[in-house]
């Protein structure tokens, strides 16, 4: 290793960790050093209370035409009017991001401190007999792993896309507010 690279990566101290449920259909992404608690002593921080949540993600499979589409929805902390991100820290009284997502989807009131992302569904194309997604200028190879996410309130405005570029190469594109 080059001397200038030392300290850039420490496998024992990741910036983020992701955990999943036993069915591997739900994931939580947490930030190891909370923006709210980073200077607090450990006993007063959120380190033992779930840490700062960055995203709650749920995966499912949905029939579309003659195919099956992998779908995803995500709940992420929202933005304040000044553009700064909400810090989803348990010390600040914020519960689990999953609870905010579940409340909203069970017909409850939407939490204005979160943003909900949904999968843009592919459409069945009779000509190629396959599900297709338009990656708008990005050359993408067909794959069941390809997806696009949009804000729920703007379903045609893609803010994240993941696509197969070559045999073992994938690209992840994202923009504000991610």
Language model feature labels by segment:
Residues 1-178:
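Cationic, beta-structured binding surfaces that engage anionic biopolymers and membranes
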């Amino acid at each position: 290793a080059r001397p200038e690279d030392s300290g850039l990566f420490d496998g024992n101290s990741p910036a983020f960790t992701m955990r999943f449920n036993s069915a591997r259909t739900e994931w939580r992404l947490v930030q190891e050093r909370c923006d709210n608690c980073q200077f607090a002593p450990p006993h007063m921080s959120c380190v033992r209370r779930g840490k700062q949540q960055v995203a709650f993600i749920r995966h499912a499979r949905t029939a579309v035409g003659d195919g099956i589409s992998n779908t995803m929805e995500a709940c992420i902390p929202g933005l304040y009017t000044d553009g700064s991100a909400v810090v989803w820290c348990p010390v600040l009284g914020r519960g689990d991001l999953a609870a905010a997502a579940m409340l909203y989807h069970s017909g409850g009131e939407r939490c204005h401190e979160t943003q909900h992302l949904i999968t843009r569904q592919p459409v069945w194309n009779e000509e190629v007999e396959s599900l297709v997604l338009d990656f708008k200028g990005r050359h993408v190879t067909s794959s069941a792993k390809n997806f696009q996410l949009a804000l729920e309130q703007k379903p045609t405005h893609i803010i994240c896309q993941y696509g197969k570029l070559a045999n073992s190469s994938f690209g992840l594109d994202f923009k504000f507010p991610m």
